[in-house]
Amino acid sequence: MNNIKNMRDIIDFAAKNYGDNIAFKYKINKNEVDEKSYNDLKNDSEAVSNALKSLNMIGKHVAIVGQTSYPWIVSYFGVVNSGGVIVPIDVQLPADDICELIERSDAEILIYDEIRHDVAERIKEKSHNVKYIISMNEKLNTEFALSLNELMAENRSSFHIEIDEEKLCTILFTSGTTG
């Protein structure tokens, strides 16, 4: 445990020591609960990292807006563990504010869930910086976004890159920076 220097080391340690133990348990709907193990977390976050690599987006800024969920968590880890900069944005902000923060952060990717489809549509129409829009939803409800699930399925393999612990990995906008 003394060799933990970054987020990836934490996930690797947990997968090695707790493997198939439950890391997350969450409701899918009123009657259905899903579970994810520490191995799932490692494999899924590495699939996100590989998806970024396949899009030539390693090290880029990635905005994420949506309710906290398992796809949100693996996206977060997949970005920071691939040397990128994650920009989590408050899902409850007005769409105009979210779009402004995405532009100010220099994000080249937007990952969103259906609750903020309005933001994805605006970014598609108005952003000059965002190159990819990725939906965290099980079912893709638009033609302009890529599916996170499909990207992960297509990019299942281990991922490793040297991480500079001194490099920026997260941009957090607080109420003081958002108005």
Q: Where are these predicted regions, by residue range?
A:
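Conserved pre-ATP/AMP-binding loop-to-beta segment of ANL
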Residues: G19-I22, S135, N155-F173
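Conserved AMP-binding/adenylate-forming core of the ANL superfamily
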Residues: D20, F24-S69, I73, F77, ...
